Regions:
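Proline-centered turn/helix-capping motifs that create local helix->coil transitions or kinks
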Residues: 61-63, 111-113, 159-163
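A structural signal for short, well-ordered beta-strand segments and their strand-loop junctions
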Residues: 40, 66, 113-118, 122, ...
């Protein structure tokens, strides 16, 4: 999936919630949260667009790539040209200067920029028994030279998810001894966290949702110039 400048210039950043205009006050929470830098933003999008893209979220799994391996069981869809106009606009808006500047304010990383390849991003579905083992994302970008992933956004888009079904994104300590924080699957809330050599995360227990329910999420990433060489021991994409 390639994001072009024309797409970004035509994007509508009014789709976001109030946080977009109050990003400065979120920085301390992001920087000081444990086990590593992260923040959970509720009402990430305005309610109207959140409901629209949830309803438009493609559920036909024949169009998805299926991951079924020891690390993860999930479906991924990243063909932006085949998404609805509202879904496309969300991805384009995430690349806009307004959103990137807000994330710079939160992270205090002034050289932050969006990933134009959206590598590993897109729309994700976990069904019953879906999982994602604890892992570290890559740092060195596998496509873009001299770039590394710095920030990960996961936006939950399933309505009326029940906590007892599992599916929360777990954040573990750097020694992988225990879970420190859980980001529950709450509709229109976004987990934003720094990607590093200690940002262990995942949903390690198989999801126990009903067969007709899907855990739907949108993923997007931001990059910085390469600072660290890729760690060959890392797992993830």
């Amino acid at each position: 999936m390639k994001v072009t400048l024309d797409n970004i210039n035509n994007s509508d950043t009014s789709i976001f919630g109030d946080w977009i205009n109050n990003s400065d006050i979120l920085s301390n929470e992001f920087i000081n949260n444990k086990p590593y830098e992260h923040i959970i933003i509720k009402n990430f999008l305005n309610n109207k667009i959140a409901n629209k893209i949830s309803n438009e979220f493609p559920s036909d799994l024949s169009n998805y790539f299926k991951y079924n391996n020891p690390l993860e069981i999930k479906y991924a869809f990243d063909s932006i040209k085949d998404m609805t106009p509202d879904l496309k606009n969300v991805f384009y808006a995430l690349c806009s200067n307004k959103v990137t500047d807000a994330l710079k304010n939160i992270t205090k990383k002034n050289n932050l920029d969006y990933d134009p390849t959206c590598h590993g991003g897109g729309l994700h579905i976990h069904e019953n028994k879906g999982k994602l083992c604890m892992h570290l994302d890559y740092e060195k970008h596998p496509v873009l030279e001299n770039k590394q992933r710095y920030l990960n956004i996961i936006l939950y888009l399933t309505k009326d998810w029940k906590d007892e079904w599992g599916g929360a994104t777990e954040l573990w300590d750097e020694n992988m001894k225990k879970c420190i924080k859980k980001s529950n699957v709450e509709f229109n809330s976004a987990l934003i966290f720094k990607t590093s050599e200690k940002s262990w995360h995942g949903l390690p227990e198989p999801i126990q949702c009903p067969e007709n329910i899907q855990r739907k999420s949108l993923a997007f990433y931001y990059l910085i110039p390469l600072e660290n060489q890729s760690n060959v021991n890392k797992l993830g994409n």
